[in-house]
Amino acid sequence: MDLIYGCGPDKGILFLEDYPSEDEFAQKKPLIGANLNLIKRILYGLQINPESFYRTCFFKRRHLELQVQIRRNKFRWHSKQTASDPDYFQEMLDLVIAEFIEIQPKVAFICGELPLNALTKRKKIRKYRGSILELADWIKIKYPTIANTLIIPLVPLRDQFADPNLTVFTQLDLQKGIKYSKEQFVHPDKRYILTVAYSAADFYGFLERCPNPEYRTIDIETNNNFITCLGFCLDGKEAISVPWIHMKEEHRPTLMKAVANYIAQPIPTVNQNILYDDTLLTRWGMPIPNISGDTMLLAHTLYPEFPKGLDFLTSIYTDIEYYKDDVKDMGSAYDPEKYKERLYIYNAKDALTTHIIYKQQLADAEELGVLDFYKKSVMPIYGMYKRINQTGLLVDDSKRKQLLIKYKTCLDYNMTLLKEMLEPDENINWDTLINSPKQVAYLIYDYMGCPEISHWKVNPKTGERMQVLSTDEDAIEELIINRVKDENIKKVLSTILICRKFYRIINWLLTPCDYDGKMYTWYNQVGTESGRTSASERPDKFRLWEDEDGALYKKPVGYSFQTIPKHGYELPDGSQIGDDLLEIFIPHDGNIFIEGDKSQAEARVVTVLSENYDLLPYFDRPPGIHRLTASWIVGGDPFKILKTDSAYDKGKRARHAGNYGMGPARLSQMTHLSYEECEIILFKFHKADPSIRDVFHYGIKEALHNGRVLITPFGRRREFFGRLDEDTFKEAFSYIPQSTVSDDIKRSGRELMERSPWALFPIEKHDSILAEIPRERKDEYVELWKDTMEKPINFNKCTLIRDIELVIPTELQWSETNLSELKDLK
């Protein structure tokens, strides 16, 4: 029979692939060629050769009909595919089990969805990777000699070629398995205690068993923002959950009082994403007095490129099996009492894993040298963002309704124009066209025959990487500017863009305000790898709305204030729409808006990193850095270039693109100029200022080649795990400038807010902060702003050390009417 048989030492560790590669089929050997080299690279740092494993594969002979589905993870054990040829699948499973019996592995690494399904009855290998699992019950009963084999799922090797970050996770998973091939594994159920406190006596008994904790972890579960239970862990060994809604009535007064009194104690408290839990607990009258840590924030400080969810952190820092679907898979309708019991254990497990994770994270932070940065620059600004989240902006509802009428009319008019430009087609639904990537792709590439632009997309459920046609704004602008010559098609493409922008504006204007008439936002401190925040609607607030049929549904309150365009949306022809959107935001009676921002902050940092110190004075004296840059590109006297001239815009955008190593294609999207013209612009820019490439870019590339790590002046660290290609370098070029400016505004913002408790702070935008203050305190605020915001940045800690202290000047604008009418404050 034409089978691929396993090979390797008859001991210890078994490595099981799912479907062999073409080379493996050709040579009738598992784990050879590129796959073997990948595992060798992963294990190199551990000084372990994968050829010391017994290596085999699940599918030992070809099955042509299923080859494509298997490679794309589109299969399940006992699904339609397996049912189509059950004898084949059973044969493969029997052969693998026979190998297990012969080899008697202590640990088996399995790659692929189907082996996971078949051997453990688990689904979704991306969730279970890194877990330590047991074989399925029926296998353990039928074949008791292999009942103690530990199963550790790994992400399929073919997926790791596409995403280098996954190889780091695999290294951690392999390290865990190798450890337990040499020592005894004690199941977490035998090491940890998870209980439920149904009475105050239960809760006090738990507290007495650990009277002096180094820190405690608290976790809450919610339903529609109502607390359902609270979990506590004090020692990383035992955790307890307290039912909150479904307490027994006879225990409710004493148990609630016991919990509230305990939360009020100033014990150092740690949580996963504590901002949400603290916000909810504060709303319910139980604020946490001593917040000392957050596993999500520390995870971002340690490895900003990694996932930050508790499920991932559990997989790399603990031996606890993936459990985040335990409650979801059961469903409350199945058995309400069993559901509640499982929910409470799930809640306690969250508190337990958070405690275990944080202790190991602290050790990692000490080893990597970021513990001081975390304690001084990350956790202290937690309160700043909690305050911003609770502020919001007052909305002028009459102005909002006026703008809605205006932009709905604009959308209808442009949709009518679009219909008139196109012949009827059964594949186009005019009611859903603009918001449907599938229909827009059909219209652009099939109906009009435009040159195809595609991108790679990863299916978050299966991990499948597939190439899809691009229909986003950048792709359409690229077609308009560089790819399409037909003016009629360009007009259609431009109209699609315009309609999309109007649709986006309308959707934003329909964003629900809270019952107090204010629009809110919610900041995420781990928003980007650079340390910049991101923002979204509030997860802790929603409004009930009616649909067209009168049915009620929930809609989150708020929006990302960071993404609201200050000057509207720019169209390919350079015109603007939506430049009046901020008119809906008004100050409270007696208040004014005042916004301060760092002047050309990132460009100044790049200039320092480029060691072009002679250029720094031009940022603050005539003709100004952008006029000077424009003169390099268009020639002439920089003093004669006006801010309204197209040359000024070219200079401004060319500096941004040149600083971060962008190519002519990206600059073309930014400027709406042709690819050829942008090539010339960048050539002239780098010829006039070669220090950016020769000093700054060179230094970044050298640092990545030498250690893959960049450290900012404030001590923020990022390790780059991806391929060292042009995309990675571009990301690295922007890291230090963006991170430095963001951390500068945060350190100053924290002090500013502490010294102005009378001010409201609704928005932070990376290099700027908006405040709403009493009119009579304007001068006091300006003085505070200058005192806190214009502080020197020392580059001695930076990867690219520079002997200079950079002070970034700031600019202020203010308004008494609305946020759209900000004017310079002299």
Question: What role is predicted for each listed range?
Answer:
Residues F15-E17, R216-D219, N271, S292-G293, ...:
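Short hydrophobic beta-strand that contains or immediately precedes a catalytic carboxylate
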Residues K179-H246, I263-Q265, L280, E305, ...:
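Conserved "right-hand" nucleotidyltransferase catalytic core of DNA-directed polymerases
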Residues L230, I274-M286, M296-Y303, Y317, ...:
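Short active-site loop/helix that positions an aromatic residue
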Residues W284, R400-I434, K438, F685-I700, ...:
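Polymerase palm active-site segment centered on the conserved acidic dipeptide of motif C
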Residues G383-Q390, D516, Y520-T521, Q525-T528, ...:
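Conserved catalytic core of nucleic-acid polymerases
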